[in-house]
UniProtKB/Swiss-Prot annotation:
GO terms for biological process: aminophospholipid transport; intermembrane lipid transfer; mitochondrial genome maintenance; mitochondrion-endoplasmic reticulum membrane tethering; protein insertion into mitochondrial outer membrane. The keyword Transmembrane applies. This is Maintenance of mitochondrial morphology protein 1-2. It comes from Yarrowia lipolytica (strain CLIB 122 / E 150). Residues 108-122 have a biased composition (Polar residues).
């Protein structure tokens, strides 16, 4: 029996009540509904607040008090605050406050602003110079006997710290702010410089000073170029005048015959800033400076210490005559004298030392001025463990000349070493008085009148 195809298609249409179009529309609607549910209940879901119905009132009161504190108002205890900062989502800080010791402080290192948190155990925090807070019950006798510490009594009600929200909102009505006090720490100018420049004297590593070596080399190159501009005539004339200004009678005129400024440069390294204390002018640290006896010095100053190494050939050659057995009585009438020609050449071969450079103030008490005179001093000296290697060459006589006499060489070497120690080796120092950039006030009327009278007397005497 054969069933017609029309009957089969009609039966299939009666069994399937949905067509392709109806299925497509139903699928799209289901996808849209699913997306809407996800967006509403998952992504844009409102946070459920664990607080009770009266929390909104407490939060509004807390915000009003925060605005009052931020504008520079006063809290219930009469303590002026500078600002409050909160963060509602800081769970880690809440846990840290819950597990921390009572009365602990939150402070920022390297700043003069200190944060105070009131203690819940009734302890009175004590502020030291480093900004840390210590409960009075745990400070001990050392804190009680210190006169530089600052004790701030605070109530025992718990408050909030920076970014920490308390669990109980009922305490926000009175005490709910952290107090930021601007403490003017009594720091010396040297300590303040170190604090603001973040330089730790104990932990800072020495510096190489490569850039400074290049700068010094350029300066030395310019000095050598200026000296050789006129065949060293200007330099030779200056040295001749310096040598012949003060010389004994048995030495004839000194003539500079050779000068060599070298072709190498000093190398500075291992520079470090130290904190060096100095005493009054009469102590050993200030001896040999040709300073006034009534000068005083600061208790402490910064000092730059660095190693210097110079390997070069800096040569100075002179010639003169030694006048021997010259009779003083017959010298106006007869020129009976015996002279011995001497030629010397001194060369600096190697110099290594530890260089100290410091900048401090000298306070000089004057009778004319009511105020003391302050001068800025730049001092330079070397430590005693220096090494100065010299090469001395000599030539004595006119006809039968003696070359490189050991006795004369050792004598010249010892004299130069002694002169260097007496002028530039610690405790002696080479000082430079730096000029003031700002004009100083005129002296008192008495001093001005005395100066005018002195000038008038001088003018009358010259006329």
């Amino acid at each position: 029996m054969v069933i017609p195809a029309e009957l089969i298609q009609k039966a299939l249409k009666q069994q399937s009540g949905w067509g392709f179009t109806e299925g497509l529309v139903l699928g799209q609607l289901s996808v849209i509904i699913t997306v809407i549910i996800i967006l509403k209940f998952v992504i844009f879901a409102e946070n459920k607040s664990p607080k009770k119905g009266n929390d909104m009132t407490a939060v509004s009161a807390k915000d009003k008090e925060a605005e009052h504190v931020a504008m520079g108002g006063q809290t219930a205890n009469g303590v002026k605050t500078s600002g409050v900062r909160r963060n509602k989502s800081s769970t880690n800080l809440r846990n840290r406050l819950a597990t921390g010791a009572a009365g602990a402080s939150i402070s920022r290192p390297g700043s003069s602003r200190v944060s105070m948190v009131r203690s819940t155990s009734g302890a009175v925090p004590v502020l030291g110079q480093n900004g840390g807070a210590t409960p009075r019950g745990m400070a001990g006798s050392s804190v009680a006997g210190s006169t530089s510490n600052l004790a701030v009594p605070v109530p025992t009600t718990p408050t909030i710290a920076e970014g920490i929200e308390p669990e109980n909102d009922s305490t926000l009505q009175d005490d709910s702010a952290i107090i930021d006090l601007d403490l003017d720490l009594d720091l010396s100018p040297v300590d303040e410089i170190l604090h603001k420049t973040c330089y730790q004297l104990s932990s800072h590593a020495p510096e190489s000073l490569d850039w400074f070596n290049v700068l010094v080399a350029q300066i030395i190159t310019q000095l050598r170029f200026d000296a050789k501009a006129n065949n060293n005539l200007n330099l030779l004339n200056s040295l001749d005048a310096a040598f012949n200004s003060k010389r004994p009678d048995f030495i004839d005129r000194i003539n500079v015959t050779e000068i060599n400024l070298g072709d190498d440069y000093p190398i500075l390294s291992n520079c470090k800033i130290t904190h060096k204390g100095t005493g009054p002018a009469g102590s050993g640290a200030a001896s040999g400076n040709n300073m006034p006896n009534n000068a005083e010095y600061d208790d402490s100053r910064l000092e730059a210490q660095m190693d210097i190494d110079l390997s070069d050939t800096i040569t100075l050659g002179i010639e003169t005559r030694l006048n021997l057995n010259q009779p003083k009585i017959l010298s106006p009438f007869l020129s009976l004298s015996t002279s011995l020609p001497v030629s010397l050449s001194v060369t600096i071969v190697r110099f290594t030392a530890r260089l100290n450079i410091s900048l401090y103030q000298q306070i000089e008490q004057t009778e004319e001025d009511e105020k003391d005179k302050r001068d800025t001093i730049l001092s330079i000296n070397f430590e005693p463990d220096y090494k100065l290697q010299l090469s001395v060459k000599s030539l004595v006589g006119s006809r039968s000349r003696l070359q490189n006499v050991p006795t004369l060489e050792s004598l010249v070497d010892s004299k130069i070493q002694k002169w260097f120690r007496d002028h530039y080796v610690e405790p002696h120092q080479m000082i430079f008085i730096l000029p003031s950039l700002w004009p100083r006030k005129k002296r008192s009327a008495t001093a001005g009148a005395a100066g005018t009278a002195t000038g008038a007397d001088t003018a009358s005497g010259s006329s």
